[in-house]
Curated annotation (Swiss-Prot):
GO cellular component, one term: cytosol
Species name: Chlorobium limicola (strain DSM 245 / NBRC 103803 / 6330)
Organism classification: Bacteria, Pseudomonadati, Chlorobiota, Chlorobiia, Chlorobiales
BP GO annotations: carbohydrate metabolic process; glycerol-3-phosphate biosynthetic process; glycerol-3-phosphate catabolic process; glycerophospholipid metabolic process; phospholipid biosynthetic process
UniProt name for this protein: Glycerol-3-phosphate dehydrogenase [NAD(P)+]
Alphabetically ordered keywords of this record: Cytoplasm, Lipid biosynthesis, Lipid metabolism, NAD, NADP, Nucleotide-binding, Oxidoreductase, Phospholipid biosynthesis, Phospholipid metabolism
Catalytic activity: sn-glycerol 3-phosphate + NAD(+) = dihydroxyacetone phosphate + NADH + H(+); sn-glycerol 3-phosphate + NADP(+) = dihydroxyacetone phosphate + NADPH + H(+)
Entry's family note: Belongs to the NAD-dependent glycerol-3-phosphate dehydrogenase family.
Keyword Calcium: no
Binding residues for sn-glycerol 3-phosphate: K105, G136, S138, K191, D244, S254, R255, N256
Record-listed E.C. numbers: 1.1.1.94
Function description: Catalyzes the reduction of the glycolytic intermediate dihydroxyacetone phosphate (DHAP) to sn-glycerol 3-phosphate (G3P), the key precursor for phospholipid synthesis.
Compartments where found: Cytoplasm
InterPro entries documented for this protein: 6-PGluconate_DH-like_C_sf, 6PGD_dom2, G3P_DH_NAD-dep, G3P_DH_NAD-dep_C, G3P_DH_NAD-dep_N, NAD(P)-bd_dom_sf
Amino acid sequence: MHIAVLGAGSWGTTLAVLLARKGYAVNLWAHRPEFADQLAAERENRRYLNGVRFPDTLRVFTSLHEAVSPADMVVTAVPSQALRETVEQIRDLPMQGRVIVNVAKGIELKTGKRMSEVLLEALPGVRISGVAALYGPSHAEEVSKEQPTTVVASSPSVETANRVQEVFHTSMFRVYTNTDIIGVEIAGSVKNIIAIAAGISDGIGYGDNAKAAIITRGLAEMSRLAVSLGGDPVTVSGLAGIGDLVVTCLSRHSRNRYVGEEIGRGRSLDDVVAHMNMVAEGVFTSKAVYDLSRTKGVEMPITQAVYEMLFEGKPVQQAILDLMTREPKKEVY
């Protein structure tokens, strides 16, 4: 079996290595030719995943067409806001019969579309039954070291979800299946926004009570939005929801939590992002989800607060005061 992995960041590289370790022929595509040449020469990704050697069955490509042409399965691991422009470059390739597995977590800013919707629009011939999302609490730094990890492969097609499960499952990378791709994609997107809020709380110096409140009420926002779009509320209690939410809000590896923490300490968003080595998906997703929540009439006060702090310059302390002094309500999910 041939598998193409599009995106040579930490997560794309990790999955490429995982699949190659299983013996699959893996084509890893890097966006920048000079970076691809470096990966091919050094046989590891020293920029994002230093010390993890590439198996012999992993090849690095600069050409999207060459990477994808022989592939039975295509894994999209580029940033969510770059997904459409990336896959549109291969729209002339026949996609029937291929499984597309997206691992990018976000909502497209300009359209409010989920990642599976973007793939369906950008790739003629692709059907939703051939698209899957692989989400869950899975930091690349741990997966690459073969530390125990559990994720969920979600597709409206049971057959596709099972196929993805079979391909990715290892003794240390346990894959469950799920058919609620709407709930999974919304959960995977919203959790990054809530992680920014959790980081802001850390940066200010608040304690465990505040963090627990953010995670719990953030889960409520995640559930409300998922349900409004046709998702199953049970999904947010699984790996793509509470599982990924907890790890992203608490882990030292979390880019989104780091962005929030630095903002809580007084740094500007532009300054934080300019000095980061990797993409924090929650930044643009906060605007996309805020816009989507307004369109759907879904109350998401934490998401709104993050959006206002990041994009409208609202002072952190004022945003927190506004959150805490809202009209008292029932605890309704």
